[in-house]
Amino acid sequence: MKIELNGIPDGLEVYEHTGSGYERTMHYGEWRVAFLNWAEKFDFSSDFPPERHMLTDEVFVLLSGTAVLEIGTDKKPVQLEPERIYNVRAGVWHRVKVSRDAKLL
Protein backbone atom coordinates (compact mmCIF):
# COMPACT_ATOMS: atom_id res chain seq x y z
CA MET A 1 0.00 0.00 0.00
CA LYS A 2 1.29 3.45 -0.87
CA ILE A 3 1.62 5.62 2.22
CA GLU A 4 1.75 9.37 2.53
CA LEU A 5 4.48 10.79 4.74
CA ASN A 6 5.24 14.41 5.54
CA GLY A 7 8.49 15.67 4.09
CA ILE A 8 8.78 13.13 1.25
CA PRO A 9 10.24 14.89 -1.80
CA ASP A 10 8.48 14.92 -5.15
CA GLY A 11 9.43 11.92 -7.26
CA LEU A 12 9.67 9.49 -4.31
CA GLU A 13 6.97 6.99 -3.34
CA VAL A 14 6.91 4.95 -0.12
CA TYR A 15 5.08 1.62 0.23
CA GLU A 16 4.42 -0.83 3.06
CA HIS A 17 2.40 -3.97 3.78
CA THR A 18 1.33 -4.54 7.38
CA GLY A 19 -1.40 -7.14 6.80
CA SER A 20 -1.02 -10.88 6.44
CA GLY A 21 -0.11 -12.82 3.32
CA TYR A 22 1.16 -11.68 -0.05
CA GLU A 23 0.58 -8.25 -1.57
CA ARG A 24 1.81 -6.97 -4.92
CA THR A 25 2.76 -3.70 -3.37
CA MET A 26 4.35 -1.81 -6.26
CA HIS A 27 4.50 -2.47 -9.99
CA TYR A 28 5.72 -0.74 -13.10
CA GLY A 29 5.45 -2.11 -16.62
CA GLU A 30 6.21 -5.81 -16.48
CA TRP A 31 7.95 -5.90 -13.10
CA ARG A 32 6.57 -5.71 -9.58
CA VAL A 33 7.70 -5.74 -5.98
CA ALA A 34 5.68 -7.55 -3.34
CA PHE A 35 5.77 -8.11 0.39
CA LEU A 36 5.03 -11.49 1.92
CA ASN A 37 4.05 -11.67 5.59
CA TRP A 38 2.84 -14.70 7.53
CA ALA A 39 -0.52 -16.14 6.54
CA GLU A 40 -1.95 -19.60 7.24
CA LYS A 41 -1.08 -20.74 3.70
CA PHE A 42 2.63 -19.94 4.32
CA ASP A 43 2.80 -21.45 7.84
CA PHE A 44 5.34 -24.22 8.47
CA SER A 45 2.43 -26.60 9.20
CA SER A 46 0.64 -25.82 5.92
CA ASP A 47 0.66 -28.25 3.01
CA PHE A 48 -0.32 -25.84 0.23
CA PRO A 49 0.97 -27.01 -3.16
CA PRO A 50 4.20 -25.74 -4.72
CA GLU A 51 3.99 -23.37 -7.67
CA ARG A 52 6.14 -22.43 -10.63
CA HIS A 53 6.24 -19.50 -13.01
CA MET A 54 7.11 -20.41 -16.57
CA LEU A 55 7.87 -16.90 -17.85
CA THR A 56 9.69 -15.19 -15.00
CA ASP A 57 12.09 -15.78 -12.13
CA GLU A 58 10.92 -14.98 -8.59
CA VAL A 59 13.13 -13.32 -5.99
CA PHE A 60 12.83 -13.72 -2.21
CA VAL A 61 14.60 -11.50 0.35
CA LEU A 62 14.12 -12.28 4.05
CA LEU A 63 13.83 -9.05 6.04
CA SER A 64 12.90 -10.51 9.43
CA GLY A 65 11.75 -13.72 11.07
CA THR A 66 12.40 -17.19 9.67
CA ALA A 67 11.66 -18.62 6.23
CA VAL A 68 12.40 -21.77 4.26
CA LEU A 69 12.14 -22.17 0.49
CA GLU A 70 11.30 -25.67 -0.71
CA ILE A 71 12.80 -26.11 -4.17
CA GLY A 72 12.12 -28.64 -6.94
CA THR A 73 9.82 -31.62 -7.13
CA ASP A 74 11.66 -33.18 -4.17
CA LYS A 75 11.02 -29.99 -2.11
CA LYS A 76 14.64 -29.55 -1.02
CA PRO A 77 14.57 -27.10 1.94
CA VAL A 78 16.73 -23.97 1.83
CA GLN A 79 16.88 -21.91 5.03
CA LEU A 80 16.76 -18.22 4.06
CA GLU A 81 19.28 -15.85 5.61
CA PRO A 82 18.38 -12.18 6.12
CA GLU A 83 19.37 -9.64 3.46
CA ARG A 84 20.37 -12.23 0.84
CA ILE A 85 18.71 -12.47 -2.57
CA TYR A 86 17.30 -15.90 -3.44
CA ASN A 87 16.34 -16.13 -7.12
CA VAL A 88 14.07 -19.03 -8.12
CA ARG A 89 14.54 -19.52 -11.86
CA ALA A 90 11.56 -19.66 -14.21
CA GLY A 91 10.01 -23.13 -14.42
CA VAL A 92 11.31 -24.34 -11.03
CA TRP A 93 8.74 -25.68 -8.55
CA HIS A 94 8.88 -23.91 -5.19
CA ARG A 95 6.97 -22.86 -2.12
CA VAL A 96 7.87 -20.75 0.89
CA LYS A 97 7.11 -21.40 4.55
CA VAL A 98 7.49 -18.64 7.12
CA SER A 99 7.30 -17.92 10.86
CA ARG A 100 4.57 -15.67 12.24
CA ASP A 101 7.03 -12.78 12.58
CA ALA A 102 8.43 -13.15 9.06
CA LYS A 103 8.57 -10.37 6.51
CA LEU A 104 9.89 -11.03 3.01
CA LEU A 105 10.32 -8.83 -0.01
Model regions: which residues?
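A short, N-terminal "cap"/entry segment at the start of jelly-roll beta-barrel domains
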Residues: 1-35, 42-43
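Conserved short histidine dyad/triad with adjacent acidic residue
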Residues: 35-54
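Short, conserved beta-strand element in jelly-roll/cupin
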Residues: 52-69
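Short acidic-glycine-tyrosine-enriched beta hairpin
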Residues: 73-90
